[in-house]
Amino acid sequence: MAVFTAGALGVDFDLVDLGPLILAPPASATPTSVGLSLLGSTTQIFGSGFTFATAGPPTAGTINRIIVGVDAGLVYDITGLSLSAATFQGWVAAGDNVSAKAGIFGGADQIIGSGVADRLRGFSGDDTITGGAGADFLDGGDGDDDVYGGTGNDIITDSGGSNYLRGDEGDDNLVGGAGFDDINGNMGSDTVSGGLGDDWVVGGRDNDLIFGEDGVDLVYGNLGDDTLDAGNGADTMRGGQGNDSLMGGAGNDYVSGDRGDDTMTGGAGADLFHSFADAGIDRILDFNVAQGDRVILDVGTTFSVAQIGGDTVITMSGGQVILVGISMSSLRTDSIFLG
């Protein structure tokens, strides 16, 4: 398992270029360490059984640590390696940065960002990535990853596996992948997308924009005035506190505005709209009796139903559900029920 720790200067994985090391003459070379200095940076390599050519990194042995720095300070420190020096030297000689990064970070790695903006990637394996402070770009890559944005307005993405993604503080953009993702924007006004798969997608605090996308998703606004779009699939949507907008999309969805004055649409499918006493005033914009839409109220709720203008209005203590454009006479006996 590689442990990558960024220095105070910040790191962009996409700009890391190992190729020039092939030209650097070994300095203070021993069987366990060497320094390679070129173009204003110094790379220190530690391990065992090293042998060397006239230039470049070790040609034989095992590498267990790589430290890269510049005059201004540490760039990054990689520990926990068990890497063939000959393989590493081959990547460097070929200028093959893609294979080098994939090889170094091919396991269950821990990647720790700096206090400024970083661009970090996990590659394959079940990785833990922490962005720290700064506006970071964090990509978990393949595997089942845990990714934490830290403070700052971060972009977090993870294309494969089943992932645990947290925005932490800041206005973050989080995008899940093809598997089951547990995503929470936490603090800040976040944009959160589940991607493919059956996901748990939560906005957290503040006013969030939340997309379930494909799959059977749990989409939850939590605090703030949130906008929720469940996408395709038989989804469960909850607005939480605040005045929320909930859109079910295709599929038989469960839609609950929870507390606050909420606006709800179920989309295609037989949708179940939930409310309760003291929940606020909820408006259902596309209630469709023919599709099988229904309203479920908590057990024990006392309510009345009336036609007010062109709408059917369900009134409870401290709340209403307004079926916009629906005639009360068109409702079925089970269109409104307790459960």
Identify what each model region corresponds to.
Residues 66-123, 130, 139, 148, ...:
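Extended, small-residue-rich solenoid/repeat segments and analogous flexible loops
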Residues 1-85, 100-105:
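Extended interaction-bearing regions that mediate binding to partners or small molecules
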Residues 1-27, 117-302:
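Acidic, glycine-rich calcium-binding repeat modules characteristic of RTX/beta-roll
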Residues 44, 274, 294-296, 313, ...:
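General beta-strand recognition
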Residues 28-35, 61-65, 252-254, 268-272, ...:
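Short, hydrophobic/aromatic-rich segments at coil-to-beta transitions
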